[in-house]
Amino acid sequence: MLGSLAKWLRLLGHDTTYPGPLGDVEIGATAQNEDRVLLTRDRELARRVRGAYRVRSDDLEEQLLDVVRRFSLDLAESMTRCSVCNAELESVRKPQVKGRVPDGVYARQEEFWRCASCGRFYWHGSHWDNVTVRLRRLGVAGAHEDGPPVDESPAPDSRVPPG
């Protein structure tokens, strides 16, 4: 399973889908129909699907480095996608998030982003700092401190109630 790798690729701004409970035939067909590279740990699936790439490591950091290097991924425009559903993020004004993010976050942060699809809110918090540190440790280009965030709120239907 490469769900964690998919989430990290999204955090780095790459359009990345994760198939969920589909069979191999459906996964391969979806990749072909959407002109995507299929990343898989499954040797047989990688052999059967044209253009698939087999990720060999079980370690997330090794997987990330492997894929970034293999496909020469540009990381300059990181955090433009929702880490959960892959939709694009849009900047929102601070008053729009009041009561939808934790009170402390609202008090400390000035910039917020919202997923255009699932409605999650993001901000530049400590999680973004941790991601940046991890990317720098891995030597991944484009690991910078500014830019959109990684901390996130639940989707609006499960949002934090107003204080």
Annotate each predicted stretch with a short phrase:
Residues 91-98:
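Active-site/ligand-binding-proximal alpha/beta "capping" segment
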Residues 1-12, 108-111, 124-145:
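Extended interfacial segments that mediate partner engagement and assembly in macromolecular machines
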Residues 1-77:
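Long, charged N-terminal interaction/targeting segments
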